[in-house]
Every structure is written in structure tokens, then in C-alpha cells.
Amino acid sequence: DYDVQFELIDCTTGLPLEDHIAPNTSCYLRVTNRTPELLYMNLLDIDSKGNKYLVLPMDAAATCAHLLVPAMSTWSFKAEPFIFGDEPSDETLLLMAVREPVDFSIVMDTIKTGGQGTMRVGLNRRFYQVK
């Protein structure tokens, strides 16, 4: 529903990572919001065993303000770096974007908005191999 994209940026080089990533690579998320709306974003990592991880943590107050990406802009989450594991793995990364603050840990269920039905969600998926 929303025109959003992401790439992973190598913390050491500052360059986008390719589809094949070396083990223990440290990186951060850079997202592009091509909509006229302010959007909350998070990244879900699904490994080859089906384990799921949210890349960006919730803030203590659960306001999600740190997950906001301005309209028509590119934003780097440099303050939230993460490291791929040391074992070979296939990783599917799914960017989620919504207009209202959401506890993204609920992504295993249908996302609802205040009991008023489903909400529009922007998704962008990329596949990486750690080897």
C-alpha cells in the first residue's frame, strides 16, 4: 500500500550490502519513504529456521517515535546497528510501514487499528545469504 524501500548499510564501509553477507557483519537499516505521509517503520528478520526477530527495538515509553520516517525522505537508523550471526544462514528481511504507532511484535497476527478494522501497510522484502 505504501511506496517504501530499504537497504542494509555496512557499519564499517558505509556502503550498501549485497545479497551475500560475510558472517558477523555489522550493519544498520536505511529506509526510503516515497509517500506524502509520515510513517512508522520496522524490519522483521526471518532466518532459515523460521525464527523471527524485530531489528528495531521498542522504546521504553512505547511511543514508537524513534521509528518515524518523514514523508518523501530517506532515513538511516545508525543508532540501532545489528550484527548477522557467525553461522551460514538464509535471511528474509521484511520492511513494514504504517501510519499509526504499532507494537511491531504483533506482526504474527493481522494488524488492526483501534478495533476499527485492518490498516494499510507498506511492505518491502529482500533476501540475504550469510556465508
Question: Which residues fall in each region the model found?
Answer:
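Secretory-pathway glycoprotein ectodomains that are cysteine- and/or Ser/Thr/Pro-rich
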Residues: 1-131
